[in-house]
């Protein structure tokens, strides 16, 4: 059983027939939200095309809500697949991470910072 499936519906911030969204309990930034399929699948690659579409529809809905409630300056959106990529909960979830000017010294490179030395590939130019 997935811990996500035990979260009460009152904590959901959005949902559709195939997925739901809730705020991350260990947020990277204010508004950090997880979008999760109702069906327990470990990774994006195990989700059906319909589930993938439903997840991205909720990513859009969450982004619109966060634009109004948190006014971020940008977003990182993504998921981890496998332990080597940092996955610790083996129920697919898409991170919607609002980003704010000044939340890190130099954000260039975005998701490339998962390997810190590779983050800002422009530094050597």
Q: Positions of the model-derived regions?
A:
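HIT superfamily nucleotide-processing domains
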Residues: 1-125
């Amino acid at each position: 059983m997935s811990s996500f499936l035990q979260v009460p519906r009152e904590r959901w911030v959005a949902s559709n027939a195939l997925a739901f969204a809730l705020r991350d309990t260990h947020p990277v930034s204010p508004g950090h939200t997880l979008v999760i399929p109702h069906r327990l699948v470990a990774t994006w690659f195990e989700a059906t095309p319909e589930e993938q579409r439903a997840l991205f529809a909720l990513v859009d809905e969450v982004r619109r809500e966060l634009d109004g409630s948190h006014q971020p300056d940008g977003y990182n959106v993504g998921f981890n697949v496998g332990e080597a990529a940092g996955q610790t909960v083996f129920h697919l979830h898409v991170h919607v991470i609002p980003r704010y000017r000044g939340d890190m010294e130099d954000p260039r490179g975005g998701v490339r910072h998962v390997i810190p030395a590779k983050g800002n590939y422009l530094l050597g130019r």
